[in-house]
Amino acid sequence: MNENLFAPFITPTILGITTLPIIITFPCLILSSPKRWLPNRIQILQMWLIRLITKQMMTMHNKQGRTWTLMLMSLILFIASTNLLGLLPYSFTPTTQLSMNIGMAIPLWAGTVIMGFRNKPKMSLAHFLPQGTPTPLIPMLIIIETISLFIQPLALAVRLTANITAGHLLIHLIGSATLALSSISMTVSTITFSILFLLTLLEIAVAMIQAYVFTLLVSLYLHDNS
């Protein structure tokens, strides 16, 4: 097989126009809003998960930080549903694109930092210089803390991109091996298929965990600045 290993990660286009904006709207079709007095089982499960995540993630925040509840819940649902849809055959996962993940990380990170400098300027500046620092080390520590601050959105985006991309590559490789071995040894092919099935279950868990980790880190940045 001469297929490019990274071909599934190329953004699909129609007549040279990217279809990424259309793909991003797909999660809205899954997370439907209730139109009746009594919601169905899927909507009940959806609301239960939202309440559970909200309780775990927003308990540590003050009144000002809790104004971000809707934003953070929308973020985790969007990333989780996008990752899960990307596991379907012949689909595309937008979160494998570093540019898109950076586009999500930078505005959220910048919003928390701006909030901190606007509401608690002295405390925000104090993060650049830990208490009790020796005088000769002050310039170096300020530079290090500044670099670590600006690396935060990049780390958010790279972590999500790397984990989702690595999982898709493993599924692609083991799936190709299963197909190739089916004409050689059915026993080995069955074993490989079993590994592929277990890996797919693992990727479903990773898809949801990475959405939770991304949102949790944004929540921690918000907690430090609110």
Curated annotation (Swiss-Prot):
Catalytic function, reaction form: H(+)(in) = H(+)(out)
GO molecular function terms attached to this record: proton channel activity; proton-transporting ATP synthase activity, rotational mechanism
Cellular component, GO annotation: mitochondrial inner membrane; proton-transporting ATP synthase complex
An example Gene Ontology biological process: proton motive force-driven ATP synthesis
SUPFAM superfamilies, sorted: F1F0 ATP synthase subunit A
Chain segments annotated as transmembrane: 6-26, 68-88, 97-117, 138-158, 164-184, 195-215
Highest rank taxon of the organism: Eukaryota
One protein family per Pfam: ATP-synt_A
Keywords associated with the record: ATP synthesis, CF(0), Hydrogen ion transport, Ion transport, Membrane, Mitochondrion, Mitochondrion inner membrane, Transmembrane, Transmembrane helix, Transport
Topology with respect to the bilayer: Multi-pass membrane protein
Localization per Swiss-Prot or TrEMBL: Mitochondrion inner membrane
PANTHER family linked: ATP SYNTHASE SUBUNIT A
NCBIfam families: ATP_synt_6_or_A
Subunit structure: Component of the ATP synthase complex composed at least of ATP5F1A/subunit alpha, ATP5F1B/subunit beta, ATP5MC1/subunit c (homooctomer), MT-ATP6/subunit a, MT-ATP8/subunit 8, ATP5ME/subunit e, ATP5MF/subunit f, ATP5MG/subunit g, ATP5MK/subunit k, ATP5MJ/subunit j, ATP5F1C/subunit gamma, ATP5F1D/subunit delta, ATP5F1E/subunit epsilon, ATP5PF/subunit F6, ATP5PB/subunit b, ATP5PD/subunit d, ATP5PO/subunit OSCP.
Family to which the UniProt record says this protein belongs: Belongs to the ATPase A chain family.
UniProt protein name: ATP synthase F(0) complex subunit a
